[in-house]
């Protein structure tokens, strides 16, 4: 932002059909990275390759065939009913006029996410969890190879957090797409992710499977928190114990 560098030397590769989570403390660059990938923010340099194609050089319409984006649940941008909100996701394929096939695609994702009953409801009147499902559905009908999600569980209670994360994990498997999400909750990231990228002050500190990234050492280094990390069903579980005073944020 302005003259300050938010991201520095960020490089990573992701295998297809994986659920990847970007974690880190406030200000680490998680959401900025997601927004740079989707070109909401313009990076000063570098490239973003999907199937060896650089999306930074594509038109918005062409890019939308490769990348879809789910904003935070607190963003309320659609003054329409749920069906029409989701139909907007077909824009890269249909222009402004939809066909019967496009409407069938909408009904398909409504059924997939079990929200058919909400089809004619006003988007702005839905609960936070329902809105998040609709935004995920909108991204799915876009039929992009990579789905980006910015804090998909923010402002949701624990039941709806699990509901949304289960949907994302199931969609990655069923649709064979890649999901990249910024997330605050380390336990959710550990339980659901195939791969985790841990950031601090705009740099990648660790990247790999949950067992190699979610460690007591990394949590102390990145979050300045002493934590006990235990294994449950071969996944790390984090129990924060105390803050580490005096260390630099």
Regions found by a protein language model. Give the residues of each.
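Helix-to-loop junction immediately C-terminal to a conserved catalytic motif
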Residues: 38
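Conserved ABC ATPase signature
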Residues: 122-126, 130
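Conserved ABC ATPase "signature" region
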Residues: 87, 101-118, 143
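Conserved ABC transporter NBD signature motif
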Residues: 46-54, 63
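ABC ATPase nucleotide-binding domains
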Residues: 222-249
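Catalytic Walker B motif of ABC-type/P-loop ATPase nucleotide-binding domains
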Residues: 147-151
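The feature captures the beta-strand-to-loop junction immediately N-terminal to the Walker
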Residues: 23-25
